A protein has these predicted regions:
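Phosphate- and other anionic-substrate recognition elements at nucleic-acid/protein interfaces
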Residues: 1-135
């Protein structure tokens, strides 16, 4: 995937059964949120989106990226996509390779920051479910 210049904000999400970890980085490589999390519920989603939108001033300039890990992110993906956000799925292998390259341990918080950085750099192969194409 090549970095898409139309985005300013990159939201990396590591999905799990009960809670999701997330990080937000901007196109200037500054983390706006480095260690966020929210419960895998409607109320958690609403809190998450409110938090993200409080840091990202233009919702049309946000790219959300989620690591593919079973079914835990399905509702989140569908909700974001149905609200018109651009959401892409990244493979766990891409995250692992990047994390290993940086010499980092495996944690959900670290994975969410790695996902955000990969989105910014455009270094991962992503599957865009909305448009059914591979970058």
């Amino acid at each position: 995937m090549k970095k898409q210049d139309s985005y300013i904000y990159f939201v990396g999400i590591d999905c799990a059964q009960n809670k999701h970890d997330f990080a937000v980085i901007n196109d200037q490589k500054k983390f706006l949120i480095k260690k966020g999390h929210f419960s895998n519920t409607l109320q958690g989603y609403e809190k998450f989106l409110k938090t993200v939108l409080s840091k990202c001033l233009n919702k049309d300039k946000i790219l959300f990226g989620m690591e593919v890990t079973g079914i835990y992110g399905t509702n989140l993906y569908e909700r974001l996509a149905s609200e018109g956000y651009h959401v892409v799925i990244i493979s766990p292998d891409s995250v692992k390779k990047y994390r290993d390259y940086k010499g980092l341990n495996k944690t959900d918080k670290i994975d969410s920051t790695c996902i955000a950085e990969l989105l910014l750099k455009g270094d991962a192969q992503l599957v865009d479910i909305q448009k059914k194409r591979i970058y």
